[in-house]
């Protein structure tokens, strides 16, 4: 008896789904065995990440790195999508791609095997994908299965709900919330306005949740033309973050500067002298961690949505091949990472909430 065409197609689809799940499970098991038994990384034997642009598959020249760089601290921008429109954003919504969850986990395993101790999830807005569930599953995986000392997130905070803390707060060490001003009109000018929602009020609510669910609280501020004269001393002291990261507004060609950019950040720029004046005004804030353009540009290991390292040394974000294709050791050669500057800017610090000994 012949099987009807529709039924045959359905059976084939179910078989393909089961086969795909089996392959993902075997890939995960193989990565775990490599970590446990110390097997060498097959590197180029890995399949190409689905959805990665074809142009990134071209062969790069080997820069001849004498000693492999250890990816101790990695910033994974798994999405470029965002619900805010900050005028100076330097990681804009140029694609809508997000890796399948199991592929992202496979890449995180490779990073762990290569020596990663801290992962920071960013975007875009990381809580946009699947209402924060995608992010939560990665956070739990990194803390529970990879046993990373530090798992952190950078978010604008607008989409975070208390339920997320209840489900995933135990696995998160640090939550960094972007706040560039305590004047709501300035936030609107910058692009952080969201209708009737008040960014500053939301910040205070998130601070309480972090305390309630024992997550270290951090604030990130980008100092620009619209907030450079603001006095934030009392607000920051009242919120009492473990760190207040203060960045100087930075231009990145192709992101917030140049013909193919989605933002025009030139009007937000400030001089080095203006940035120093802001720092002097806030020198008595003990948690202040300043980062000028010089310190910031080459001192971060950045992975994009395809798990490619982004090299910012030329003022652009030039991608390596994906670690899912060639492995971490090969891809990181093209990251442009300045390890000395990473250490000089204080990139290595007490980043596990177990070691922070906070008074919750």
UniProtKB/Swiss-Prot annotation:
The gene is Rsad2. Its main location: endoplasmic reticulum. It comes from Rattus norvegicus (Rat). Interferon-inducible antiviral protein which plays a major role in the cell antiviral state induced by type I and type II interferon. Catalyzes the conversion of cytidine triphosphate (CTP) to 3'-deoxy-3',4'-didehydro-CTP (ddhCTP) via a SAM-dependent radical mechanism. In turn, ddhCTP acts as a chain terminator for the RNA-dependent RNA polymerases from multiple viruses and directly inhibits viral replication. Therefore, inhibits a wide range of DNA and RNA viruses. The lineage of its organism: Eukaryota, Metazoa, Chordata, Craniata, Vertebrata. Belongs to the radical SAM superfamily. RSAD2 family. The keyword Nucleus does not apply. It is found in: Endoplasmic reticulum membrane; Golgi apparatus; Endoplasmic reticulum; Lipid droplet. It is a peripheral membrane protein. Induction: By interferon type I, type II and LPS. Interferon alpha induction is rapid and transient, peaks 4-6 hours after stimulation and returns to basal levels 24 hours after stimulation. Interferon gamma elicits a more prolonged response where expression remains elevated 48 hours after stimulation. Induced by infection with Vesicular stomatitis virus and pseudorabies virus, presumably through type I interferon pathway. Residues 44-71 are annotated as: Disordered. It comes from the Eukaryota. There is a cross-link at residue 205 (Glycyl lysine isopeptide (Lys-Gly) (interchain with G-Cter in ubiquitin)). It catalyses: CTP + AH2 + S-adenosyl-L-methionine = 3'-deoxy-3',4'-didehydro-CTP + 5'-deoxyadenosine + L-methionine + A + H2O + H(+). CDD domains: Radical_SAM (cd01335). Keywords: 4Fe-4S, Acetylation, Antiviral defense, Endoplasmic reticulum, Golgi apparatus, Immunity, Innate immunity, Iron, Iron-sulfur, Isopeptide bond, Lipid droplet, Lyase, Membrane, Metal-binding, Mitochondrion, Mitochondrion inner membrane, Mitochondrion outer membrane, S-adenosyl-L-methionine, Ubl conjugation. Binds 1 [4Fe-4S] cluster. The cluster is coordinated with 3 cysteines and an exchangeable S-adenosyl-L-methionine. This is S-adenosylmethionine-dependent nucleotide dehydratase RSAD2. Its cofactor is [4Fe-4S] cluster. Homodimer. Interacts with IRAK1 and TRAF6. Interacts with FPPS. Interacts with HADHB. Interacts (via C-terminus) with VAPA/VAP33 (via C-terminus). Acetylated by HAT1. HAT1-mediated acetylation of Lys-196 in turn recruits UBE4A that stimulates RSAD2 polyubiquitination leading to proteasomal degradation. 'Lys-6'-linked polyubiquitination at Lys-205 leads to RSAD2 protein degradation. Residues 49-63 have a biased composition (Basic and acidic residues). Residues 68-288 form the Radical SAM core domain. IRAK1 and TRAF6 synergistically activate RSAD2 increasing its activity with CTP as substrate about 10-fold. GO terms for biological process: CD4-positive, alpha-beta T cell activation; CD4-positive, alpha-beta T cell differentiation; defense response to virus; innate immune response; negative regulation of protein secretion; negative regulation of viral genome replication; ossification; positive regulation of immune response. The modification N6-acetyllysine is found at residue 196.
């Amino acid at each position: 008896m012949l099987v009807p065409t529709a039924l045959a197609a359905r059976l084939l689809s179910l078989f393909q789904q089961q086969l795909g799940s089996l392959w993902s499970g075997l890939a995960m098991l193989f990565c775990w065995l490599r970590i446990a038994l110390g097997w060498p990384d097959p590197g180029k034997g890995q399949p190409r990440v689905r959805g990665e642009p074809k142009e990134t598959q071209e062969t790069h020249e080997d820069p001849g790195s004498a000693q492999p760089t250890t990816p101790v601290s990695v910033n994974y921008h798994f999405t470029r999508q965002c619900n805010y429109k900050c005028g100076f954003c330097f990681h804009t919504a140029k694609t809508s791609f997000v890796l399948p969850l199991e592929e992202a986990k496979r890449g995180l395993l490779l990073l762990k095997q290569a020596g990663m101790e801290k992962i920071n999830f960013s975007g875009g807005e990381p809580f946009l994908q699947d209402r924060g569930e995608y992010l939560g599953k990665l956070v739990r995986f990194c803390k529970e299965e990879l046993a990373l000392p530090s798992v952190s997130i950078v978010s604008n905070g607008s989409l975070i709900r208390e339920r997320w803390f209840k489900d995933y707060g135990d696995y998160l060490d640090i939550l960094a919330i972007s706040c560039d001003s305590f004047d709501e009109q300035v936030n609107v000018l910058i692009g952080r306005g969201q209708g009737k929602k008040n960014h500053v009020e939301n910040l205070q609510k998130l601070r309480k949740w972090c305390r309630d669910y024992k997550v270290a609280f951090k604030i990130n501020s980008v100092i620009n033309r619209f907030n450079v004269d603001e006095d934030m001393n009392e607000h920051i002291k009242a919120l009492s973050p473990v760190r207040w990261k203060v960045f100087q507004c930075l231009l990145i060609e192709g992101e917030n500067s140049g013909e193919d950019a989605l933002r025009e950040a030139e009007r937000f720029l400030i001089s080095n002298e203006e940035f120093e004046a802001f720092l002097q005004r806030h020198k008595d804030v003990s948690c202040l961690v300043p980062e000028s353009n010089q310190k910031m540009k080459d001192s971060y290991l950045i992975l994009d949505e395809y798990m490619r390292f982004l090299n910012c040394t030329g003022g652009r974000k030039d991608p390596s091949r994906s670690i899912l294709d060639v492995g971490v050791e090969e891809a990181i050669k093209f990251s442009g990472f300045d390890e000395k500057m990473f250490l000089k800017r204080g990139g290595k610090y007490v980043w596990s909430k177990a070691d922070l000994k906070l008074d919750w």
